[in-house]
Amino acid sequence: MEVIASLAHYYDQPLRCFTFGDFLLVPIIKEFEEILGCPLGGRKPYLFSGFYPFLDRIAKIVKISAQELGNQIENGVVGVPRKCLEEKARALASQDEWAPFIDVLALLIFGVVLFPNVDGLVDLAAIDAFLAFYNSRESPIVTILADLYDTFDHRCEKSSARIACYTPTLYVWLVSHLFRQEGRHVCPLKGHRSCIEKREASWD
């Protein structure tokens, strides 16, 4: 988190990039496709329709009653508590119900890693993005990148603003540009892991 907070100081809002003297770094779609392992390809990009989904749609997937989900409100935000989903995932794993387990795990990734909003809660915005991917295979990459720029813009306007979203992705993206080695891996995450070995990695 400290690394990302430091990175924010180098963000140039008018240019929409990070500036290091005469050197510019710009997050692009292709890089985020590789990091997240989710190529856009011919997929339709996810765009919020303006209407949040009914909870009964997600209830069928995570195997939790819609009534129970409807009672989950935190700080005025409707969603599914992370703790509730984690408990459900453990229960499904203990029963060897791997298909719904994977669905619950994917929802947790969308709510906790990709689209975090309220701590400890997977809100309706994250659920909507998950359902678009689950039902129509819509790619969240474009939305993630747009939210990333919006977050740093907000940080420029209000220095106390917290950077909560995409910090793992941003960290891998940054490290993939700081380190280089021969035969660079297609996935920057793999390159990041191998850069621990000093003899194989070098600074640009």
PLM features per residue range, with description:
Residues 1-204:
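Structural stabilizers in ordered domains
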